[in-house]
UniProtKB/Swiss-Prot annotation:
A GO CC annotation given for this chain: small ribosomal subunit
Source organism per UniProt: Laribacter hongkongensis (strain HLHK9)
GO annotation terms (biological process): ribosomal small subunit biogenesis; translation
Domain of life: Bacteria
Keyword Chloroplast on entry: no
GO molecular function: rRNA binding; structural constituent of ribosome
CDD domains, alphabetized: S4
Residue intervals passing through the bilayer: none
Subunit structure: Part of the 30S ribosomal subunit. Contacts protein S5. The interaction surface between S4 and S5 is involved in control of translational fidelity.
Cross-referenced SMART domains: Ribosomal_S4, S4
Sorted UniProt keywords: Ribonucleoprotein, Ribosomal protein, RNA-binding, rRNA-binding
UniProt domain S4 RNA-binding: residue ranges: 96-156
Gene for this chain: rpsD
Protein name: Small ribosomal subunit protein uS4
Known function: One of the primary rRNA binding proteins, it binds directly to 16S rRNA where it nucleates assembly of the body of the 30S subunit. With S5 and S12 plays an important role in translational accuracy.
Length: 206
């Protein structure tokens, strides 16, 4: 399955919520009518069946993190194997992806841009260049911008904005050095309450 490269607003309208695909730090443009379906006439969202509700939540989470279906299923299987809550485990696996950590540290303004930085070898983990967006970052890992990439204006601008707003508690970042530490995978209480991971667990359990 190919990665979606079309209008980001269309995805947000399909899910009926801001997926933060266009900007990392602010809500989506008001022109994007989230209560209307995508399309020329933008009909109102229909009432969903129980299956539809579960499917939409799964799709929403998958699109927020920019993960394809096959990989998302693998993450769910891994989450089931781990001790504890399967739903929380799933979110921690997604949050530990290198592209997501780069986003959380403010190097990229969106997860898509952060994924591009990783793929273009602009990111270093513990002193080694890593160009795999799905790489699982571990507690204590140091994630920084590669020396030759520190002059990129987009990285500096994104970091400046992230510093103003504040970094999440599970990472520590030195904006001047463009270096950060992944302290630990976030607890469920630290993540968005707009996500209902239990619906994903129920979806795959049916």
């Amino acid at each position: 399955m190919a990665r979606y490269t079309g209008p980001k607003c269309k995805l947000a309208r399909r899910e009926g919520t801001d997926l933060f695909l266009k900007s990392a730090r602010r809500s989506i443009d008001s022109k994007c009518k989230l209560d209307s379906r995508p399309g020329q006439h933008g009909a109102k969202q229909p009432r969903l069946s129980d299956y539809g509700i579960h499917l939409r939540e799964k799709q929403k989470i998958r699109r927020i993190y920019g993960v394809l279906e096959r990989q998302f299923r693998k993450y769910f299987a891994e989450a089931e194997r781990r001790k504890g809550s399967t739903g929380e485990n799933l979110l921690q696996i997604l949050e530990s992806r290198l592209d997501n950590v780069v986003y959380r540290m403010g190097y990229g303004s969106t997860r898509a841009e952060s994924r591009q930085l990783v793929s273009h070898k602009a990111i270093v983990v513990n002193g080694e260049v890593v160009n795999i967006p799905s790489y699982q970052v571990k507690a204590g890992d140091v994630v920084s911008v590669r020396e030759k990439s520190k002059k990129q204006v987009r990285i500096a601008e994104s970091l400046a904005l992230a510093e103003q707003i504040g970094f999440p508690g599970w990472v520590s970042v030195d904006p001047k050095k463009m270096e950060g530490t992944f302290k630990n995978a976030p607890e469920r209480s630290e993540l968005s309450s707009d996500i209902n991971e239990q619906l994903v667990v129920e979806f795959y359990s049916k």
